[in-house]
Regions:
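N-proximal low-complexity "stem/linker" segments adjacent to membrane-targeting elements
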Residues: 1-26
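Short, charged/polar "capping" segments at the starts of alpha-helices
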Residues: 19, 43-50
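Active-site-proximal specificity loops/subdomain of glycosyltransferases
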Residues: 48-108
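Short aromatic/hydrophobic "clamp" motif used to bind/position activated sugar donors
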Residues: 115
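Conserved donor-nucleotide/metal-binding helix-loop-beta segment in metal-dependent transferases, i.e.
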Residues: 122-157
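Catalytic core and acceptor-binding pocket of nucleotide-sugar-dependent glycosyltransferases
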Residues: 168-259
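Long, low-complexity C-terminal extensions of enzymes
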Residues: 242-302
Length: 302
């Protein structure tokens, strides 16, 4: 299905992660309620997308056309110089922050009112809409709390503190470009924090002893910014997704029957690269006999 409001989705993903869930990329393209799904990454990723059978609804955007990776890498390396002591900065540390900055900076190149960000390791189980009956977009909420996210955002924008009980982190978000740009401009106006671009100020706002712990969340920050400053722009919805799907299913062999079963409880399932199916879960959750008697949520809770 496609929402009445036309917009695209961006999926920021590495070539390795694109290949890791390759058999499910078509499902991401087919099930997201968007006009096009734009995979954002390196030129190698662009080649993989071009060689795929994802069809005309899939596209590619070079990450360096949004923000050059080297700019972010060099900034983090300079900030961490007293920790690194001449050693090379692991690309993974820079990559975690970089992919979040891409999702925010995309608002400045997007030609539509909205765009969605969708995590590349997460696969929709069923159709869904990102807009309520009143035409407002949804913030989808889950349960998560990481104090350092709020420490960082409060340095960036001192009026931001935890505002709602739940979390805005739900493996995806629909962004209103106008308000994302407004937030980025507000961050860039904060003369108390070093840096010129918003992403520089974010990096300089993170406590050095926590910079290797992924201490910023683009979803938590934008959701909190909107809840505090523009509380009537978005609807709130509880989002049910299977975050630890990789412990129960192999992404390369999960079937339509499995997705139909999962969809009774969940909008989406995630296959994180650190997850693998435990031996005692093999042939258990994909067993049609068990699926006919129990829901996925009941199986997990047993």
């Amino acid at each position: 299905m496609t929402d009445t409001e036309l917009y695209d989705a961006i999926v920021v993903v590495t070539p390795n992660d694109f290949k890791r869930v390759e058999s499910n990329n078509k499902r991401i393209v087919d099930y997201l309620p968007v006009r096009k799904v734009l995979f954002v990454g390196s030129k190698e990723l662009g080649e993989l997308v071009a060689q795929s059978s994802l069809g005309d609804k899939a596209g590619f955007v070079d990450e360096n056309d949004i923000i050059p990776f080297d700019d972010v890498y060099n900034c983090i390396r300079d900030i961490m110089s007293d920790i690194l002591l001449g050693r090379e900065l692991p690309r993974g540390i820079a990559g975690w922050y970089y992919q979040q900055f891409l999702k925010l900076q995309y608002a400045r190149v997007c030609q539509d009112k909205y765009y969605m960000s969708w995590d590349g390791d997460t696969v929709p189980c069923k159709d869904f809409s990102m807009f309520g009956d009143d035409g407002r977009p949804y913030f989808d909420l889950k349960h998560e709390f990481h104090e350092e996210y709020f420490t960082t955002m409060n340095k960036l924008l001192p009026n931001l503190n935890k505002t709602i009980d739940k979390s805005f982190i739900s493996e995806h978000m629909i962004f209103d470009c106008h308000y994302v740009i407004k937030m980025l401009e507000d961050i860039e106006k904060n003369a108390a924090v070093k840096g010129k671009m918003f992403w520089e100020k974010i990096l300089y706002s993170i406590r050095l002893e926590h910079i290797q712990e992924n201490s910023f969340s683009e979803f938590e920050t934008f959701g909190t910014y909107m809840a505090v400053n523009y509380p009537d722009i978005y609807n709130y919805r509880n989002w049910h997704s299977f975050r630890y799907g990789g412990y129960y299913f192999h992404p390369e062999v999960i079937t339509q029957r499995d997705y139909d079963w999962l969809s009774k409880d969940f909008y989406a399932i995630s296959f994180e690269k650190s997850h693998s199916v435990r031996e005692d879960h093999e042939n258990l959750f994909n067993n049609p006999v068990y699926q006919s008697k129990l829901t996925a949520r009941q199986m997990v809770e047993i």
